[in-house]
Amino acid sequence: MEPRVGNKFRLGRKIGSGSFGEIYLGTNIHTNEELAIKLENVKTKHPQLLYESKLYRILQGGTGVPNVKWFGVEGDYNVLVMDLLGPSLEDLFNFCSRKLSLKSVLMLADQMINRVEFFHSKSFLHRDLKPDNFLMGLGRRANQVYIIDFGLAKKYRDSTTHQHIPYRENKNLTGTARYASMNTHLGIEQSRRDDLESLGYILMYFLKGSLPWQGLKAGTKKQKYERISEKKVSTSIEALCRGYPSEFASYFHYCRSLRFDDKPDYAYLKRIFRDLFIREGFQFDYVFDWTILKYQQSQLTAPPSRALNPAVGTSAALPPGISNIDRYTGEEEGRPHMESSRRRVSGALDNSGNISNQPTSSSARDSMIPSSSLFAQSAGSSRRVTAVSGSRDNFPGSEELLQRSRTGDVSRGVIPRNSPGEAGKSTRRHYESVVKGIDNLQVSDEHHPH
């Protein structure tokens, strides 16, 4: 007899595991919808699934928050049934040879700030923001960023009175040392400013490929955290952001200027990145680096490459051959008091090269390759010519930004325009031929629940 949980969910193959238990692919026996099922032994030393399920319930309905289908106890296990999601940003970062373009980073930043703002609006801090804890959706939501893993979240204010928790010092490090804020390293109680600083480190990690305090050697875990802290404190914002647009330094300066109980101006942070996005001449079309790479691979292989494996409320897709040391065990830069709640299973997608610094030249469909969104590159130019897909993730501000990018209505500067000429004509001819050729492009939906 096939194993079931909650009398309506079929337990399938294991797709991941972690210190808290196992992650399985599940199916709703009534609708045949694929889901993620987390199992945690009721006798585990640090139970977190019940707490996490309560937070998911509080956050239900928010954009980019996985839906919880069921929580309960089956035999010796706590069980959480929730949406099946796509690969994590760490997976996709690895897939793109560990570097993302400015365009991709800015499109992600807009959604990620929104997710953190929503989390804070519900009176909670995440306290463990990292690329592994942001996942992309599947199917029609493949361009939407989801936030997951609330095991270390903490309520920072009273939900009714909004009375903030008191300032405290001598706190142990909670979260992942690589992305922890300076104040967290210094033992100061975390607040909203610290989540945002962690997000800034994630963005620089995507742009640079690594952070200055990675790869430091030490004898013990405690010494490791101390070395990371020393390096982080000694690395100025200007040094960290050198070679990249000044908006990133402005982001960090703003985060570090906040007092302990200040409410951040999330709109300001989104605005500086949106204005940069417009000045660069980008189109808000949801064509990410991995979208282009996946399309390029589909053109080079027959049959086309399979999509990245779907994941659970924790990600389960990782292209083979990619080493990502100490992302889960905590031995390198993980959690000092609680092991990460995930391990990853291999995906099936190979990466043939890093396209982060290459001009974009192809297109994509909604799941990974939107058929009506593509780039056409003119000779010697990195300017984009884009037909924008009508099926977008409607997170706040995207339509406004798209309209501004079309009209050039920007508060800080004007988009430079290429002069017409043979290069432009060549671009248009190439664009038209690609549009004709891509109309019939089919991508397998075998892993998509929708």
From Swiss-Prot:
**Where on the tree of life does the source sit, at the highest rank?**
Eukaryota
- The Protein kinase domain extends over 9-278
Q: Where is the composition biased (Polar residues)?
A: 349-365
Query: What are the positions of the active site?
Result: 128 (proton acceptor)
Under Pfam families, the record lists:
Pkinase
Q: Where is the composition biased (Basic and acidic residues)?
A: 328-342
Which reaction(s) does the protein catalyse, per the Swiss-Prot or TrEMBL entry?
L-seryl-[protein] + ATP = O-phospho-L-seryl-[protein] + ADP + H(+); L-threonyl-[protein] + ATP = O-phospho-L-threonyl-[protein] + ADP + H(+)
Q: Which GO terms describe its cellular component?
A: cytoplasm; plasmodesma
Binding-site positions, ATP: 15-23, 38
Its quaternary organisation is: Monomer.
Report what the protein is called: Casein kinase 1-like protein 1
The organism named in the record is: Arabidopsis thaliana
Q: Which gene encodes it?
A: CKL1
